[in-house]
Amino acid sequence: MKILVVGKGGREHALALACSKSQLCTALYAAPGNPGMAKFATCVDISDSDIDALVTFAQENE
């Protein structure tokens, strides 16, 4: 399962970290993410408030 975590704060970091440990997770993206998340997720340079860009990214990486 591919997962996109939207945000850059501590809660999103904790959620992304938990997802990264799942055997079901095949790809993990964080938008915009933070340096800590970059250790276990692919951070993409999309603002968490840019809904159109987030939807486009999710559709392209389905």
Where are these regions (language model features)?
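ATP-binding N-terminal substructure of ATP-dependent carboxylate-amine bond-forming enzymes
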Residues: M1-E62
